[in-house]
């Protein structure tokens, strides 16, 4: 990790930049993980090659350095080399980033599981949190500096102190209880939770994701403030959504059944295709995608390669492949 800023190819990189040396015994492993990947556009279907552009799928910036002279100047500002235990200790010591004025109000960047979990914790504690509705921070959260301090040490947050009079926001009334579809029945023999652990991947992943973000979950749709998940909705959940329950559905099971909920929707899946990285555009800026737009997230990972080939004229398209 660099201890001072340095300049390479006209770009200045700050202290704290991670450097992975190719002068090590396992350099091929590191290069295999970090190289830019292989673009194959001559085949319409490809299963055997996994996506290797980890910087794009995992969300970090990466630059390859191939000039010996630059190795020396960059190495000169690096700290000691780290092994696995050192890396774990380093990440454990990371703290939230705060800029701007203290003792005013705080913009929390809506950029991670931690930011959502922090907001949910504040809401459950009866604190006031808003979502910014316009301007450069549209889609981010805002709270008091005192409330920010109660969660800053528990989560990794990007925050900026601001004068609230310059920010337009809508108060979030509560931390929503989320219905996760597809709750498996308990086993009648042996370990009762076997279906949940080993036979219900979609439900399991969704439940884990909601827990990571601090949401309370329920298997009873009548007790939910929203629904989200990869499993197809049952009859009761469909009725609730049609009656106005907010719903986030993804995966083939959910997307292919969208026509059951909304007239005029058609879903198309490329036969045999698996996944891809695709450039995207955002046709409409809303509170749902504003933080993606602000962060310049113009490449997204797609699993399953299904897409909505037709939507109603009244629909708001949030993201679109720009192939």
Model segments located where?
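Intrinsic-disorder/low-complexity accessory segments
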Residues: 1-323
């Amino acid at each position: 990790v660099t201890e001072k800023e340095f300049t390479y190819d006209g770009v200045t990189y700050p202290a704290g930049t991670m450097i992975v040396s190719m002068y090590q015994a396992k350099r091929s492993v590191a290069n295999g993980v970090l190289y830019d990947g292989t673009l194959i556009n001559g085949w319409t279907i490809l299963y055997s090659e996994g996506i290797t552009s980890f910087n794009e799928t995992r969300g970090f910036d990466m630059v390859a350095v191939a000039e010996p002279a630059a190795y020396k100047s960059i190495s000169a500002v690096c700290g000691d080399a780290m092994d696995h235990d050192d890396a774990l200790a380093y990440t454990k010591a990371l703290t939230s980033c705060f800029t701007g004025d203290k003792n005013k109000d705080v913009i929390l960047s809506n950029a991670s599981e931690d930011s959502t979990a922090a907001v949910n914790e504040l809401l459950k504690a009866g604190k006031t949190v808003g979502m910014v509705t316009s301007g450069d921070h549209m889609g981010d959260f805002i709270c008091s500096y005192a409330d920010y301090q109660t969660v800053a040490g528990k989560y990794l947050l990007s925050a900026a102190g601001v004068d609230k009079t310059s920010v337009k926001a809508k108060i979030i009334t509560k931390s929503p209880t989320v219905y996760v579809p597809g709750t498996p029945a308990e086993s009648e023999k042996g370990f009762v939770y076997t279906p949940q652990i080993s036979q219900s991947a979609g439900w399991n992943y969704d439940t884990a994701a909601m827990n990571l973000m601090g949401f309370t979950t329920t298997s009873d749709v009548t007790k939910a403030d929203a629904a989200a998940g990869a499993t197809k909705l049952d009859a009761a959940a469909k009725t609730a959504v049609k009656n106005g329950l907010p719903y986030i559905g993804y995966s083939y099971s959910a997307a292919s059944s969208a026509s059951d909920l909304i007239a005029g929707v058609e879903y198309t899946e490329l036969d045999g295709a698996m996944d891809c990285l695709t450039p995207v555009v955002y046709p409409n800026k809303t509170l749902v995608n504003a933080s993606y737009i602000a962060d310049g997230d113009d490449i997204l990972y797609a699993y399953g390669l299904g897409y909505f080939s037709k939507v109603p004229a009244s629909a708001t398209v949030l993201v679109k492949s720009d192939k």
